From Swiss-Prot:
Summary of the function given for this chain in its UniProt record: Component of the autophagy machinery that controls the major intracellular degradation process by which cytoplasmic materials are packaged into autophagosomes and delivered to lysosomes for degradation. Binds phosphatidylinositol 3-phosphate (PtdIns3P), and other phosphoinositides including PtdIns(3,5)P2, forming on membranes of the endoplasmic reticulum upon activation of the upstream ULK1 and PI3 kinases and is recruited at phagophore assembly sites where it regulates the elongation of nascent phagophores downstream of WIPI2.
Family according to the record: Belongs to the WD repeat PROPPIN family.
Record's keyword annotation contains Repeat: yes
GO biological process: autophagosome assembly; autophagy of mitochondrion; cellular response to starvation; glycophagy; nucleophagy; pexophagy; protein localization to phagophore assembly site
Protein name, as recorded: WD repeat domain phosphoinositide-interacting protein 3
Motif (L/FRRG motif): 224-227
Species the sequence originates in: Danio rerio (Zebrafish)
Length: 344
């Protein structure tokens, strides 16, 4: 969740995002960066710079390397540079410079992937990174890009040059033709892979439908309806076994859908009527909860299979529990920016 150019809450938070397995989340601040354990909530690292904001923090599971990009009113690093921070040495150890602003960075143990506004560059994750690939995209100001973290799957997915399409390439075999998925008619707003890299979920700027595709052939597996009104989708995430997804938007609601068993999702009693528009056959979330503040948030599943965590731009942390009937209750609330590493 990128909160640049300005966070209306005035708390210094510029960025919040989960690591690959959602076990941690990192925050970029106007004066440094922080790392938290997701569930249970605990501050793990806090680095404050005398002067300098961090607009993007990308973790690599729980290892000591993080990718940082400068941001905010006084960026710590130039926004056209990717800095790899070694948390054991407490300093940057790799620096990659570009001619334009960096929109996002993705990491896996052997690759650094840098997203610019109309291209994606792939480098070796070595002390002197070597550029391996360049992929063109459509205009991509949000820096949409997902990299499968699985050691047996090297898929990279990003917006294709054709608006609304997703391109999936296998970094282990770039000779293989990419998979092109005509996911939406409108501009893409959000894309995410499951941990295994077998499924991709997408949403467009309209934000009413979430589509799930098979990554090997690009076949549509499910179409899920978030709502009937346009919404800005902030985040989509699968759970560990890709049986569920959670979705957050600017309506202040987090929706939970069944990704594998469509019968769990709600459907209109008029769904079987063939003369009615497709809308009536839509599959709706089986559970949802309102983030009390209505603040922008990112969401992910917690350590328990029936828990969803929301990390909000106003510094609030929520843990909600849902049951098979779809009933939801708030389990934990905290202000994570006000924590210290002693407090849980």
């Amino acid at each position: 969740m990128n909160l640049l150019p300005s966070n209306p809450h005035g708390n210094g938070l510029l960025y919040a995002g989960f690591n690959q397995d959602h076990g941690c989340f990192a925050c970029g601040m106007e004066n440094g960066f922080r790392v938290y354990n997701t569930d249970p909530l605990k501050e793990k690292e806090k680095h404050e710079f005398l002067e300098g904001g961090v607009g993007h923090v990308e973790m690599l599971f729980r290892c000591n390397y993080l990718a940082l990009v400068g941001g905010g009113k006084k960026p710590k690093y130039p926004p056209n540079k990717v800095m790899i921070w070694d948390d054991l040495k407490k300093k940057t150890v790799i620096e990659i410079e570009f001619s334009t602003e960096v929109k996002a960075v993705k990491l896996r143990r052997d690759r650094i992937v840098v997203v610019l506004d109309s291209m994606i560059k792939v480098f070796t994750f070595t002390h002197n990174p070597h550029q391996l690939h360049v992929f063109e995209t459509c205009y991509n100001p949000k820096g949409l890009c997902v990299l499968c973290p699985n050691s047996n799957n090297s898929l990279l997915a990003f917006p294709a040059t054709h608006s609304g399409h997703v391109q999936i390439v296998d970094l282990a075999n770039t000779e293989k033709p990419p998979v092109d998925i005509p996911a939406h008619e409108g501009v893409l707003c959000c894309i995410t892979l499951n941990l295994q890299g077998t499924r991709i979920a997408t949403a467009s700027e309209k934000g009413t439908l979430i589509r799930i595709f098979d990554t090997s052939a690009g076949q549509l597996i499910q179409e899920l309806r978030r709502g009937s009104q346009t919404a800005n989708i902030y985040c989509i995430n699968f759970n560990q076994d890709a049986s569920l997804i959670c979705v957050s938007s600017d309506h202040g609601t987090v929706h939970i859908f069944a990704a594998e068993d469509p019968k769990r999702n709600k459907q209109s009693s008029l769904a079987s009527a063939s003369f009615l528009p497709k809308y009536f056959s839509s599959k709706w979330s089986f559970s949802k909860f309102q983030v009390p503040s209505g603040s922008p948030c990112v969401c992910a599943f917690g350590t328990e299979p029936n828990a969803v965590i929301a990390i909000c731009a106003d510094g609030s942390y929520y843990k909600f529990l849902f049951n098979p009937k779809g009933e939801c209750s708030r389990d934990v609330y905290a202000q994570f920016l006000e924590m210290t590493d002693e407090k849980i």
